[in-house]
């Protein structure tokens, strides 16, 4: 049996595995909402975008900001956060936006919910590239030079921890409530389950991990851009 151990082959395998770990987290986060709670949302890309931009904005070194924000005098953010706090904050910002739009959109059903969340993602993509927000988001220009990861194990560890947390949530009393809502909302409400509370929890949790996944993808790609 001949195995090609060339640097190119190992590099390609590493790339595929890293991207696979990141997308595994994104798929599991989406499955929490679509599969276990029965909410057909297509807004995951928007929350990934929020996570990627939040992480990138917060971790660009101060001395590099003038090069990244060359059209906006170095931007308005003039500090650099450590990697892990910035990663958590990336998820938190995505969850915050999910909470803001959750109250109106989670009252919609089926295709209407899908259209509303997809519309949110597209509007967000356009807003981030708005010239007026350039000092923060760099408008339509690429965000780069932010903190990446040194070890290829990093995305596997982060994704593994996040997926484990999601699995624990699914197997908890909250997870059983999510499944009850998916099967029959009327019966779930008759059993004393607060529909809006649990829908919002599922929506925000899914968005939180989508934001972390978006930040990991930005690190993997070495840049963040609304078109990616």
Model features per residue range: what roles?
Residues 1-228:
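Transmembrane alpha-helices and adjacent helix-loop boundaries
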């Amino acid at each position: 049996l001949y195995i090609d151990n060339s640097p190119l082959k190992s590099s390609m395998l590493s790339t595929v595995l890293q991207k696979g770990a990141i997308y595994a987290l994104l798929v599991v986060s989406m499955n929490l909402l679509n599969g276990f709670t029965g909410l057909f949302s297509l807004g995951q890309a928007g929350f990934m975008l929020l996570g990627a931009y939040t992480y990138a904005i917060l971790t660009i070194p101060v001395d590099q900001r003038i090069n990244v924000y060359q059209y906006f005098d170095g931007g308005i953010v003039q500090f650099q956060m450590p990697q892990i706090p910035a990663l958590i904050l990336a998820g938190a910002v995505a969850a915050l936006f999910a909470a803001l739009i959750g109250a109106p959109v989670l009252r919609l059903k089926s295709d209407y919910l899908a259209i509303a969340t997809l519309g949110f993602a597209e509007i967000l993509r356009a807003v981030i590239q708005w010239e007026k927000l350039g000092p923060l988001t760099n408008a339509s220009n690429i965000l780069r030079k932010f903190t990446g990861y040194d070890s290829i194990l990093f995305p596997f560890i982060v994704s593994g921890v996040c997926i484990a947390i999601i699995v624990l949530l699914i197997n908890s009393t909250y997870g059983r409530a999510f499944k009850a809502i998916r099967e029959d909302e009327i019966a779930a409400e008759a059993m004393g389950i607060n529909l809006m509370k649990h829908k919002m929890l599922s929506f925000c949790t899914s968005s939180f991990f989508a934001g972390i996944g978006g930040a990991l993808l930005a690190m993997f790609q070495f840049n963040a851009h609304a078109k990616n």
